[in-house]
Every structure is written in structure tokens, then in C-alpha cells.
Amino acid sequence: MATRYASLDRGQCEAELGKRHIAYERVGEARGVIAPLRLKGAIAGIDFHSMLPPAQRRTSPYEIYDCRLVLALDDWARVLARYDVVEVVHYSVYRPPPAKQVLNGAGRRHSGALAIDAAIFKTRDGQTMSVEKDFHGRIGSKPCGTNAASTVGLPAQAVTLRKIVCEAAEAQLFNVMLTPDYNWPHRNHFHLEVTAGARWVLVR
């Protein structure tokens, strides 16, 4: 699915948002972002937002998403709902490029608002799952698929976090999915990315 979304232009993507009844505000321009927007509510019942206080989120550039990432998050929301997740707190989506940096085309990953660093998951009953504290990753281990690391003996929240990632990977909701098993910089979040032009899925 991520491959299909990555090929959409702004008009096609926004038309799909309309079909899905996703509330958003169009952003006129955000450097490096093809289809910038701000969310105006939950996506399929799940609230995605940064760690900023609510009053700051309304104008912060860190709350800008590319439309194509939002479509992928809408699909992922169906997976999250199976585990009673109602809120996802991220460390980063859009990282504006420096003003003096010359851009050659659209940005990628965070510079194009096409990636989210999901860090904290809150459930309907008030529980919180932190990737940093609850995933229990091991660098070099395989989180999903054939030869994935065993979950025997892991706490329930660690198992749930793996299911959240691996079910998304199986459905190919994102092109790139990096977990704490990948390296130290990803110890505290899941990096989930829609990659323009990609016809592959990488899960580490």
C-alpha cells in the first residue's frame, strides 16, 4: 500500500483523504513537502501528535505531515485499534530544512514529512507503552518475519509493540520500518516511512 500512496500527487492524495473523511487543514507551503497538511482531529479514532503542549501544536511546523504519510497512518490505525491504542505520541514527522539549504526537488524522510518517529502508545484503559522502556530490543535481532527473535519471556507490552510493527510490515503499510533492533539511535521509537519511488519494504 505504501508504494501506491507514494506515487500520488497532491490532488489525488487529498481526494483520498476526503473519501476517508479525514479532517485536515491544507498548508500552503512547507519547504521540501509535496502535500503538506495539519491534522484537525483523530485518524480513525486515534490521535497522532508530537510531545508539544496542545496550544503549540496548532502552529508548530513539527505537526505538519505529507498527505501520503497520513494515508499510511490511516491504514495503520486499523492495526492499532486492535490493541486498543487511542493515542500515538511522536518525536518527529517534519524537520524543516535549514533556510540556507538549497533543495533539489522534494524532501525525503523527515525533510519531506514522509516519516514518523512513533515513541509512545496510549491505550483506551489508560496504559502507556513506551518504545524505549517496553520494547526490549536487541541490536541485530530481527523483529518480524522468518527467523524473527523469539518473544518467549518478554513482558506483554513488548509483545504487543512487536505485533503493532509486524502486522504493519506484513500489510506493507510503510516502505521503511526501523525499530530498536536496528541501532542505538532508534532505541526509543519506531521510524515508519513512505518512500517515493520505492517498490520494496525494509523492516529492521
Please report, for each region that a protein language model flagged, where it lies by residue.
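Active-site acidic/histidine clusters and adjacent loop/turn architecture
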Residues: R4-H90
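Short, solvent-exposed polar/charged micro-motifs at secondary-structure junctions
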Residues: I34-R38, P96-V102, N188-H191
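Catalytic cores and adjacent binding grooves of peptidoglycan-active enzymes
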Residues: L37, D74, G107, G112-R204
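Mid-length scaffold segments of soluble, non-membrane domains
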Residues: P61-H90, P96-T128
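An acidic- and aromatic-residue-enriched active-site/binding cleft used to recognize and process polar
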Residues: V85-V93, D134-H136, G197
